[in-house]
């Protein structure tokens, strides 16, 4: 468990958060520029000393302002990845990695050289120097070097912000591998919804130095009282379990979490039991009173209306739905709501027109 109570005030900005975060997953600190994301990270790292703070990683206290405890940054078992990798230009990639590795006694190493280079796909780069690497390659080396310090916590401050869309798409699969294969907790700062949707298990939504929400990403994205629900990309994350594959039509069947309901997505074959993360946008769900088998829409689920919220314009409303325990959002017109008589507790059918596979 990660506990971070942080309070500080500067001219024109104040931070006041109390975060209780899981100790094994990827937590995204999400919000607009100036919301306090990087300040939180710097305080946790000890690079910024908050006057009032309590920071504990599992059983290790890094700061307790009431008791006068402050562990300096270099003694905190953490890795920090910045927007641009700060590599030593005069050293090869291998020497840069060894610099991180040699700081840790052999008995305390949780990640070795082979594991780090394979996870980040940089084995073929070891003899090169940083000036001969692309931006994405430099960032992967920087992440590998941070991992080789065997951190108890990995802090990533917008690691893809300096990369173009092509380089981002190249590096995201490697970040997903870190998520899937390592047990190191990660705090990931970003203002890009696509990155957060693909990587995060837990979401902290920050605004003006305060945490508007903190919880599992699926539940948090489905909250109608948060500004994320008003975004054009509003929707929910579903992590389904593969339960079947139709080779003729190249369709995977995914079982929804804790439910007997399924959705189908176009995808390459996967092994039964594997998990696949998807996003269903609110704009891609329509509602109907009855199920229609004579439809080109593959995914039709029985749902219950939970609540309603006005959208960002007078013509639409947002409807929160429950599909066997999985939350969904639907963005429909006020006219359609009135025609269907939509109200909390009502049973309807959700027609999902598109499912975005996050891979």
Curated annotation (Swiss-Prot):
It holds the Pfam family TOBE. The complex is composed of two ATP-binding proteins (ModC), two transmembrane proteins (ModB) and a solute-binding protein (ModA). Coiled coil: none annotated. GO terms for molecular function: ABC-type molybdate transporter activity; ATP binding; ATP hydrolysis activity. It is an enzyme of class 7 (translocase). It comes from Pseudomonas fluorescens (strain Pf0-1). This is Molybdenum import ATP-binding protein ModC. Residues 1-233 form the ABC transporter domain. Belongs to the ABC transporter superfamily. Molybdate importer (TC 3.A.1.8) family.
